[in-house]
Design a protein with these regions (language model features):
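Acidic, divalent-metal-coordinating active-site segment for phosphoryl/phosphodiester hydrolysis
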Residues: 1-9
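Active-site-flanking alpha-helical
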Residues: 5, 112, 263
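Membrane-embedded transport module
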Residues: 9, 13-199, 226
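C-terminal transmembrane module of polytopic membrane proteins
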Residues: 62, 100, 153-296
Length: 296
């Protein structure tokens, strides 16, 4: 008898133990007695929303760095000006880009299993805010990549900053590999910048996300040192890869500071509201009390 009413309702809810017809007509089917399952569904949906926001920010930030960097490096950088034997335009082999993409996909998938907090109030999509935050992260990574490319190309000049720091001169193939490693690491570190509004250490990541990060960064570093695919790229030394790691970590902190500043400015001008999160311990007690309430 309830099936027609459930079908006409905006949100039809069938309780645990309802008939098959009622469950088929309902939009939501409670799988346990009481109202606690409704609370669980709301909290879970808000956590999914948070993970989707983090995914979008991370994906856009990585894409901005990758696409804009190769556009700028191909158009405005001419390696032949630094060494006549080098090509006129800077480029990285397709196999390197494919490797970055494949390893990055694993990190992206892990975002779906990250630790997040459900918000106290319902949230809605604001693509403008997501794009602004993504750009703050992605363009900072872009600037660091362009700066490293400029310094690496000038490594053959004894008077350059690179040489004055005591770093060795590099061949063109080594420069390609160094840039490959830098972009890879920047992308993987950006996942920690994208997942919080505050500093990246304000909320612990999930084991799955950390595991994906370790695998991706480890594989990228090994490939950079023992580059097996040829195509003009040459493996770099462990020392140089260590310097690249240090460079990326410093810029990752700068990225995070830029993100925190961006959110602060957006909150100050009223574009972003300060959202409180649900206390998981109090929620559990509340859900247990609702579990004792039977729904007729």
């Amino acid at each position: 008898n309830d099936a027609p009413a459930l079908k006409r309702a905006d949100v039809g809810i069938a309780v645990q133990g309802a008939t098959s017809a009622a469950q088929a007509a309902a939009d939501i089917v409670l799988t346990e007695p009481g109202l606690s399952t409704i609370v669980t569904a709301i909290v879970t949906s808000r956590k999914i929303f948070q993970r989707m926001k983090n995914f979008v920010i991370y994906r856009v930030a990585c894409t901005e760095q990758l696409l804009f960097f190769f556009f700028i490096s191909c158009i405005f950088y001419h390696p032949s000006q630094f060494n006549e034997s080098w090509p006129q335009h800077f480029a990285i082999p397709v196999i390197a880009l494919v490797t970055i993409t494949i390893l990055n996909d694993g990190t992206i998938i892990s975002v779906a299993y990250d630790n997040v907090h459900a918000s106290m109030q319902p949230e809605k999509w604001d693509l403008n805010i997501l794009y602004i935050v993504s750009s703050a992260i992605g363009l900072t990574a872009l600037a660091s990549s362009v700066l490293l490319l400029s310094s690496a190309l000038s490594s053959v000049d004894p008077t350059s900053t690179w040489s004055q720091l005591g770093l060795p001169a590099m061949s063109y193939g080594e420069i390609q590999t160094l840039i490959y490693l830098k972009i890879s690491l920047s992308d993987y570190f950006s996942v920690f910048n994208s997942r919080t509004k505050g500093w990246f250490w304000s909320r612990a990541p999930s084991v799955i996300l950390v595991g994906a990060f370790i695998i991706a960064t480890g594989a990228s570093t090994l490939l950079a040192v023992y580059w097996p695919f040829g195509n003009g790229m040459v493996g770099i030394s462990w020392q140089l890869s260590g310097y690249c790691w240090l460079y990326v970590i410093i810029w990752a902190i700068i990225q995070d500071a830029g993100k925190v500043l961006t959110y602060s400015i957006l909150q100050y001008v009223g574009w972003v509201e300060s959202v409180e999160v649900i206390n998981e311990k109090e929620l559990k007690k509340y859900a247990e009390s609702l579990g004792d309430i039977e729904v007729e």
